[in-house]
Amino acid sequence: MNAEQNLRIPLKEADRIEVTTIIDNYSDTTLPMSEPPSETTKRFPLAVEGKIPSDALLAEHGLCLLVKTFKDDEEHSLLLDTGWSSIGVPHNMKMIGVDTSLIEAVVISHGHMDHFGALSEVLEDVAPHSISVVIHPDAFLQRALTMPKGAKIRMPVLEETAIQKSNVQIVKTKKPHSLASGAVFSLGEVERTTDFEKGMPNALIERQGKFEPDSILDDHGLVMNIKGKGLVVITGCAHSGVVNTVEYARKITGVHKVYAIMGGFHLTGPEFKQLTERTIDELQKINPTMIVPMHCTCWAAINRIAERLPDQFRLNSVGTTFSL
């Protein structure tokens, strides 16, 4: 085995973790303020100081999660992704009351537009405080999709120059990267070991002026370890496969127990429908205490997860905070 295969990251335990959904595909202000177990799932309030505000949290096809870690008297905050539009994330952070000066890093899970859309705006909101952007080099490349009738459509591109600001450190890496004083690691390129998680068959990437099939090597996520509970694995879209991602997190941390799996599982669309049951089979084997499918998991797959893992399932909605 080479050094990459023997990789083991020095992930530190956290006492607790909070994950707040800034942007997701779904919003529902009628959900109960807390749900069993009430200490873990809390919704954004419908009314503030006895009044329903005239404005509302926005939902869009995208993802942005605020992750906070707590260890003794030490607290760290970071974002995973920044949604699609330039509007949704800044608007929701203001409504939720996020103190942007405390955000230490933004991790971009991969270079698709529904994950980097408001990055420039977030960095402007954080200024003049310093912040790092952790990102795979491929996230800056031109992407495209092949449509059913053969047409090729180009995706928006994240321009590196748009995020080159005096307060921003751009960390381009293909490997796991330490954040939050070692309490969070971005995963880097995820090993693909399952025989059924095949990425996006219609995805293309431009290299040296030519489009080629895109295995979306930049797809990754976050891993944390809660003392006495186990790993928390958060995915952006899980183009690498949600099972692959969890198993890779287990491998590089040396921790087998999984407490929570959260994020987009990319089971949307007809080409992924056939993978839903197999994916849930494997998730049942992993047996997390909590599972929170979001974003590109799709309505049908989310409902099947709820049916097959009813005790572990948590419904996500914009503004929800999960206290782990």
Model-derived segments and spans:
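Active-site metal-binding motif and surrounding structural segment of the metallo-beta-lactamase
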Residues: I87-I135, T253-A260
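Cap/insert and terminal regions of metallo-dependent hydrolase folds
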Residues: H112-F116, S132, E212-V318
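Metallo-beta-lactamase
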Residues: D138-H220, R314-L324
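Pre-active-site segment of Zn-dependent metallo-hydrolases
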Residues: S54-H61, T69-A105, Y248-I252
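Divalent metal-coordination and catalytic microenvironments
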Residues: V67, D81, M93, H110, ...
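Zn-dependent metallo-beta-lactamase
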Residues: M1-E75, S186-L217, L222, I226
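A structural motif corresponding to the C-terminal end of an alpha-helix
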Residues: K68, A162-I170, K227, I286
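Short acidic, glycine/serine/threonine-rich loops at helix termini
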Residues: M33, A144-P148, K273, I305
